[in-house]
Amino acid sequence: MKRFFMLFAALFLAVSLKAQIPSAKCSADGVVRAGGSFVMTVDINKCDLSCYAQFQQLLPEGFAATEISGESDNANFYFENNKVFYQWYKLPIERNAVRLKFNVAVSEGVKVGKYEIPGYFSYQVKNRLGQIDTPVTVTVQ
């Protein structure tokens, strides 16, 4: 019986610790036409983080991002040198999830094909850095 209790306690602890690990995922309309646009969505499960954090996405040449009003979850938005950048000096504490949405325009001259778009969510807690990769694939037709 003692072994059963210890096994149950270890399993409960492992599940509890797993639940406290932040996660992030980036998604987009899978297909876009050159000259068109699509919405990029970033879902971040920040758990109980309330620290400095940032999200970055490096767009290919010919792609340009603009902020969608009201969809930045209190982050500062920048787009420069093909890089989308959201920055929080302190993540919102009211909830455990954050959602970002921004518009991506694809210029007429972009070649047809698949584009792997790298990105990441990074945060700092007690002088330790954490980073979660958030790649996404978009096909230009």
Regions found by a protein language model. Give the residues of each.
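Short solvent-exposed strand-capping/beta-turn motif centered on an Asx-Ser/Thr pair
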Residues: 45-50, 58-62, 107-109
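A surface/secretory-pathway sequence property marking extracellular, secreted
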Residues: 52-91, 134-136
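Low-complexity, acidic Ser/Thr/Pro/Gly-rich terminal tails and inter-domain linkers that flank the onset
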Residues: 19-33, 77-79
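Sec-dependent signal peptide recognition
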Residues: 2-10
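Hydrophobic h-region of N-terminal signal peptides that target proteins for export
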Residues: 10-18
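Serine/threonine-enriched low-complexity regions used as flexible
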Residues: 105-136
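Short beta-strand elements of extracellular/lumenal beta-sandwich folds
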Residues: 30-51
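Low-complexity, intrinsically disordered segments enriched in Ser/Thr together with acidic residues
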Residues: 91-113
